């Protein structure tokens, strides 16, 4: 188990519809006023990161979508310590533009911007905005070149790069970022994991059981070690923390009972089609059931559903298999982020301290 405290991030609801494809009431709003307050509450609660979403088209409840980089900057302006991860989609974005945008925001916010490189899974979105749709592994090859380009632009003067997708000739960006913005990515395919093991600082996995997550962590870390690279792991989880386990399970049942079948099935078809395009025929949602797909990132599978004590124990179990960060979604963001900070996070820190004391005693 890592001696570093597990970190916490939350999904920013900068698109409408919340994080579940359900008709259940979600006391969550996609507007900037709601999100500014949410960012401040999350910062006070002990969250280190917030992750904005990137969507160009409506679908599956997300009728309205704020652009991720501009929205990230607005949240950074409303906080003082929170790091915000801006989602960027290669294709619509070019590395030079992204590098300059992020370097400027980094300068303006004392180094608190990070980036999530989204390789793309929704073919219809690319077609709608006139972007060429690459085959599965080609999308990850492009993303890797995008990341290598960002790193080069941020760290070198007269940067020169000859790739299949991007080329630079003696390009110098000034000013550069204050430090090196962290680079995140997701994906469960072989191509995604191999990319993380070569170039990314962080790898997000979809929700899964502790055993399933351990298998992914072990695979990626072994590959990274062979590449003399280090990568940290974040896991998706939809958190339902209530005073009793019965209350939490009842909320989960209500979410699923009130799911929008047409939207869930349409999302599932698009997501699984993207996964089947990988050489191994799998992706993030290959084994997801209808109930799993009600939450976009398989967040129910991680099972952070129950009392604060139960959830804290499960988070520490995730940490024990190599998870460095929990990326949390909620039904009612503001009130539940606050509850999480008051009731769950202190228990996590207490359990971490006990585990550290036990390790110290064993060494002694």
From Swiss-Prot:
Gene3D superfamilies: Luciferase-like domain. SUPFAM superfamilies: Bacterial luciferase-like. One of its GO terms (biological process) is alkanesulfonate catabolic process. Belongs to the SsuD family. The lineage of its organism: Bacteria, Pseudomonadati, Pseudomonadota, Gammaproteobacteria, Pseudomonadales. It comes from Pseudomonas fluorescens (strain Pf0-1). Keywords: Flavoprotein, FMN, Monooxygenase, Oxidoreductase. It holds the Pfam family Bac_luciferase. It is an enzyme of class 1 (oxidoreductase). Involved in the dimethyl sulfide degradation pathway. Catalyzes the oxidation of dimethylsulfone (DMSO2) to yield methanesulfinate, which is oxidized spontaneously to methanesulfonate in the presence of dioxygen and FMNH(2). It comes from the Bacteria. It catalyses: dimethyl sulfone + FMNH2 + O2 = methanesulfinate + FMN + formaldehyde + H2O + 2 H(+). InterPro entries: DMSO2_SphG, Luciferase-like_dom, Luciferase-like_sf, SsuD_RutA_monooxygenase. This is FMNH(2)-dependent dimethylsulfone monooxygenase. NCBIfam families: LLM_DMSO2_sfnG. Its EC number is 1.14.14.35.
